[in-house]
Amino acid sequence: MNIKVSLLFILPIFLLLLTSKVKAGDIVVYWGQDVGEGKLIDTCNSGLYNIVNIAFLSSFGNFQTPKLNLAGHCEPSSGGCQQLTKSIRHCQSIGIKIMLSIGGGTPTYTLSSVDDARQVADYLWNNFLGGQSSFRPLGDAVLDGIDFDIELGQPHYIALARRLSEHGQQGKKLYLTAAPQCPFPDKLLNGALQTGLFDYVWVQFYNNPECEFMSNSENFKRRWNQWTSIPAKKLYIGLPAAKTAAGNGYIPKQVLMSQVLPFLKGSSKYGGVMLWNRKFDVQCGYSSAIRGAV
């Protein structure tokens, strides 16, 4: 009798824990755009993140020499950022994926043609991924993939994604991720996203009132459901880590945990939460507050 009672008591708890484990999501953060955010190795050692996007390779395309901009952390052109190799390898050794994010909000990148896109892909492969180059801006560390944070330029990103995917067939898994704006479909990345080559997509549900939860929760839900239709493996909600991290779109921690995450977890593609950025997360403790609910 006692055994039966115990089993009846334990089984629901076991099923709850199993469900929680299946639905557990990742936290993704952008690092590299403010020296106030601290070191990359400390970001990884915080235990808060599963993926870190190094931001940004902000100049590329139109057959120009690509340029990395880490906003005061180090000077790439003089080799000052090669010191990050040790940190990158440490992060990877503890299970954290390190991506290079290309693009951002500065008007210094574009893809003028398919050939231009393929050339950029070759540069990324040889300088940050599994290829070889005489001068690698981040040293010999091999990053886990490329993040497309594309807000400007011509829509030749299909060719860029396909060429990177071709390179990725040579050995180590190469992840492709993207951070489109929440209006659906994304005017620059839709074609690339429809190829099915992207592993993770973190949609920026901020700086776009029409699809932000705090502006209109029903529109937010409709947009999320639309985004789940793309052939990506996992879909994430992208949010500012503090009110001051973006013009609008901030969701209070308790609202996210009590109202938003339960809805998102209804999707089989739910992947977790992306935060902009590490500096604001350090200041406001957003990820540490939501970690257990993600």
UniProtKB/Swiss-Prot annotation:
Residues 1-24 form the signal peptide. The active site is at residue 151. Disulfide bonds join 44-91, 74-81, 182-211. One of its GO terms (molecular function) is endochitinase activity. GO terms for cellular component: extracellular region. Coiled coil: none annotated. GO terms for biological process: chitin catabolic process; defense response to fungus; polysaccharide catabolic process. SUPFAM superfamilies: (Trans)glycosidases. It comes from the Eukaryota. Belongs to the glycosyl hydrolase 18 family. Chitinase class II subfamily. PANTHER family: BASIC ENDOCHITINASE, ENDOCHITINASE. This protein functions as a defense against chitin containing fungal pathogens. This is Basic endochitinase. It comes from Nicotiana tabacum.
